[in-house]
């Protein structure tokens, strides 16, 4: 677990100076760069959506929560649905990053990512609950 935490920190730490520079710049170039960065975020989400249905159960990538890790069928269903949603969400992020006023870009991107994650986690919980209810009905 410590190795994973260190790798996350080593990936995130270099991003802070870049984000600070992007935030502090006020020239036209920074606005274009800002749009470019968030368009790239959208493209990354599209890529994630494309590969998510193909991911097998693992401890590195995907929605690694108790319900998905315990049941391969729930893992598959959640990642297939999430793949479609992340693909669509990536297009929405890339589109809005290019055309929406700059002051709205960050709240919209954060909102889209929050909805994508929360829907996928809720979907996993509902599938697990449904499977548990089905299992309990068979026991009677």
Task: Give each language-model segment a name.
Residues 1-37:
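Long, highly hydrophobic alpha-helical transmembrane signal-anchor segments
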Residues 4-13, 51, 77-88:
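Select subsegments of transmembrane alpha-helices in polytopic membrane proteins
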Residues 15-19, 45, 87-97:
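Hydrophobic, membrane-inserted alpha-helices
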Residues 26-38, 53-68:
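Membrane-proximal helix-loop-helix units in multi-pass membrane proteins
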Residues 30, 95-110:
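Extracellular/periplasmic helix-loop-helix junctions in multi-pass membrane proteins
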Residues 31-48, 108-112:
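Alpha-helical transmembrane segments
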Residues 56-78, 133-140:
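Cytosolic, membrane-interface loops and tails of multi-pass inner-membrane proteins
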């Amino acid at each position: 677990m410590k190795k994973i935490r260190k790798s996350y920190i080593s990936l995130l730490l270099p991003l802070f100076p870049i984000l600070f520079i992007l935030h502090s710049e006020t020239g036209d170039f920074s606005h274009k760069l800002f749009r470019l960065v968030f368009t790239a975020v959208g493209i990354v989400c599209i890529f994630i959506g494309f590969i998510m249905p193909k991911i097998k159960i693992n401890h590195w990538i995907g929605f690694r929560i108790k319900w998905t890790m315990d049941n391969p069928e729930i893992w598959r269903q959640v990642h297939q649905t999430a793949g479609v949603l992340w693909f669509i969400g990536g297009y929405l992020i890339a589109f809005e990053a290019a055309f929406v006023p700059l002051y709205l870009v960050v709240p919209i991107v954060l909102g889209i990512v929050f909805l994508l994650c929360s829907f996928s986690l809720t979907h996993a919980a509902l599938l697990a609950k449904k499977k548990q209810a089905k299992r309990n009905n068979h026991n009677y």
